[in-house]
Amino acid sequence: MNAPDRFELFLLGEGESKLKIDPDTKAPNAVVITFEKEDHTLGNLIRAELLNDRKVLFAAYKVEHPFFARFKLRIQTTEGYDPKDALKNACNSIINKLGALKTNFETEWNLQTLAADDAF
């Protein structure tokens, strides 16, 4: 089979970097960021969060081939707002939302456990 070994989907090779940022020559104030060893899960999450930012004019990603864990994210922002800053802000927002989700989940889990213990 032509599919790569499973471990190649998440382990970076020697000298391989997680991100590569290139300016997008087709649009002003835009970059193309290549994420290695990541897939639709992260691509769609970041794209959706970027589109919540009013200063982001365009955000999209594409996975070039399903066998390879790599996607390209294109970000275009308003003038005076660096696309790298938009990415940092989106990632920080995602981290905060996941932290809140974890807290809410743990609270509900503890309440359910307590209620189940009281039932006996």
Swiss-Prot record:
Record has Lipid metabolism as a keyword: no
Q: What InterPro entries is this protein classified in?
A: RBP11, RBP11-like, RBP11-like_dimer, RNA_pol_Rpb11_13-16kDa_CS, Rpo11-like
Instruction: Name where it's found.
Output: Nucleus
Report the principal subcellular site.
Answer: nucleus
Altering residue 111 to P: what's the impact?
Transcript termination readthrough
Entry annotated with the keyword Transcription: yes
Which UniProt keywords are given for this protein, alphabetically ordered? DNA-directed RNA polymerase, Nucleus, Transcription
List cellular component terms (GO). nucleus; RNA polymerase II, core complex
Mind listing the GO biological process terms from this record? RNA-templated transcription; termination of RNA polymerase II transcription; transcription by RNA polymerase II; transcription elongation by RNA polymerase II; transcription initiation at RNA polymerase II promoter
Q: Which SUPFAM superfamilies match?
A: RBP11-like subunits of RNA polymerase
- A molecular function (GO) term: protein dimerization activity
**Family affiliation:** Belongs to the archaeal Rpo11/eukaryotic RPB11/RPC19 RNA polymerase subunit family.
Query: What more does the record tell us?
Result: Present with 4280 molecules/cell in log phase SD medium.
Subunit comment for this entry? Component of the RNA polymerase II (Pol II) complex consisting of 12 subunits.
What is the purpose of this protein? DNA-dependent RNA polymerase catalyzes the transcription of DNA into RNA using the four ribonucleoside triphosphates as substrates. Component of RNA polymerase II which synthesizes mRNA precursors and many functional non-coding RNAs. Pol II is the central component of the basal RNA polymerase II transcription machinery. It is composed of mobile elements that move relative to each other. RPB11 is part of the core element with the central large cleft. Seems to be involved transcript termination.
Q: What is this protein called?
A: DNA-directed RNA polymerase II subunit RPB11
Q: Which gene encodes it?
A: RPB11
